[in-house]
């Protein structure tokens, strides 16, 4: 994807080109789309994501891969990255990955300090009380399980999307999410 645009630019610079390319970036994107059909699909997805400016919740804030994804989301102009975790741990992981400056860009959400925690507890208790879960268990679940806390954020509109499951297999994560959302098809 580098050589054809360079040839076109050289042709314009030397006067050999019949028509100048006004939008070089658009020309490069159209070449990529012709050479790789999946690139066109991904470009459309990225364009829609940038336009929507979604608040994406990243549940596993102590995982380096997740933090890199959150920073890429934020820096890529996709929207706001909300990372669930303890600020000190997130800072240490970012510094270890060489991205210490990214802490100013992302938003770290700690379950223990959330002002919405009481609302989350009441919501989760209303869902789980008939399954034999008492209030104390609900408090522990919402405070300690980052997947459940992130799902509660999403359920209450404090985020637009959720990225989770990087450190566990799908089934246990879906089981945790099932405590907040109805996962069965209607």
Identify what each model region corresponds to.
Residues 1-17:
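Adenosine-phosphate binding glycine-rich loop
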Residues 18-21, 25, 29-186:
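Anion-binding alpha/beta catalytic cores of soluble intermediary-metabolism enzymes, centered on
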């Amino acid at each position: 994807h580098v050589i054809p645009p360079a040839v076109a630019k050289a042709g314009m610079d030397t006067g050999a080109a019949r028509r100048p390319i006004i939008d070089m970036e658009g020309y490069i994107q159209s070449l990529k789309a012709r050479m790789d059909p999946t690139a066109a699909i991904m470009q459309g997805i990225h364009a829609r994501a940038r336009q929507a400016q979604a608040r994406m919740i990243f549940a596993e804030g102590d995982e380096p891969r997740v933090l890199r994804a959150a920073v890429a989301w934020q820096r890529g102009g996709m929207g706001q990255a909300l990372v669930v975790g303890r600020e000190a741990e997130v800072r240490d992981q970012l510094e270890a990955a060489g991205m210490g400056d990214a802490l100013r860009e992302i938003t770290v959400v700690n379950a223990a300090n959330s002002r919405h925690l009481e609302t989350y507890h009441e919501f989760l208790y209303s869902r789980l009380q008939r399954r034999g879960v008492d209030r104390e268990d609900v408090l522990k679940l919402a405070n300690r399980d980052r997947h459940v806390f992130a799902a509660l954020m999403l359920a209450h509109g404090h985020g637009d999307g959720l990225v989770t499951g990087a450190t566990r297999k799908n089934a246990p994560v879906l089981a945790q999410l099932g405590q907040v959302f109805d996962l069965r098809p209607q």
